[in-house]
Amino acid sequence: YKLLVNLGINSITAIGHQPAKILKSAHMKEICRSILNDGLQVAQSEGIHFPDQTLDDIMKIYQGYPDEMGTSMYYDVLNQQPLEVEAIQGYIYQKARFHKLNTPYLDTVYTFLKAYHLKFTRN
């Protein structure tokens, strides 16, 4: 569950370069829901079944965050630091590939965050 919570908010705040207030935008909120939906699809394929209201529950958690609350990935981007992309988005992305799932939002955020992260490695 925590990995899903981190998947949505960390992806949006890091790519959008904004703290939690980024979810005040209806468009960003919908993108976040789509990222979470991809994550839920992966979890289900892994045999992890969440209640139907899980996506709404996670979005309610985000609504409770203060506008200026940043995530670890947001602060990593802000401070020009490497990201924990493989531990969050990368892990879920690899599971999606294993199950041959169509996860376009997850694929996109993983690709962008991985590209940012690669500037800190020699590979």
Task: Give the role of each language-model region.
Residues 1-40, 66-67:
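Active-site-proximal catalytic alpha-helix in oxidoreductases
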Residues 33-123:
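NAD(P)-dependent Rossmann-like dehydrogenase/reductase catalytic/cofactor-binding core
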